[in-house]
Amino acid sequence: MVAQASHGPEVTAVEKELDGLSVARRIRKELVLLWADGTPHPLGTRDWLKLRPWLSAHTHLKIPARMMRYKSEAKVEAWYSNPQNQGAVDIHSDFSRLARALGGASIGLVLGGGGARGAAHLGMLKAIVEAGIPIDKVGGVSIGAFMSGLWSLHRDLATVSQSCGIWFEFMQRKSNLMDLTYPITSLFSGAYFNGSIKEAFPEDISIEDLWLPFYCVSTDISTSTERVHR
């Protein structure tokens, strides 16, 4: 299902009709949300998903301004039939990402943990960008989850580098030592660290609102089990 995000999350009559068909219930359903070019990041994705529990996945796409310029099929065909508009395919565009997903050729990046290794993750992202390799989905654990989350949000090396620089400097402050607590499960309470993570991401964003499909892994210390967040 393809929808413009600006139209609101209400379930349409067509969706209700399809939901009543027995054959439709056996088909994998995915949501593609279209966002205007220049949108900083999606918002309110959770509202769309709550109204459609039958969805298997969702994808966010930025659409070029020209897609909203032409309202008739004839004008769209005329634009694409013009040789001047037939340039090389941009493999980094959101529509190329969708095409790879539909063809089972998505490129995923998973970043590991290790504290200071986060700086190395930044260097690897730079190398991937310089090599012209698109990143379609991301995941990670510990510092890798932080770095992959930033990339899924911004998808821009300069912006991610700036956010990382601020966070690295934040974590080097001596005020970190004020976060000491009784060492039952940890030497630090985690409040200072959690606050620094929240500063790096917009307050109103959820995992569902990230541009790229994202997951991260944590450990539930109460049950010693793995938790996957996506």
What is the predicted function of each stretch?
Residues P64-A105:
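Extreme N-terminal, non-catalytic leader segments
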Residues M1-L61:
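Conserved catalytic-core segment of NTP-binding enzymes
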Residues G108-V110, R117-A200, V228-R230:
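Patatin-like phospholipase
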Residues A200-I207:
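Phosphate/pyrophosphate-binding loops at sites that engage ATP/ADP/AMP, CoA/4′-phosphopantetheine
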Residues E30-V32, G108, Y215-V217:
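A structural signal for isolated positions on well-ordered beta-strands in alpha/beta enzyme cores
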Residues E208-R230:
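Active-site gating loop/helix substructures
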Residues L61-I63, H229:
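Generic detection of short hydrophobic beta-strand segments and adjacent strand-loop junctions
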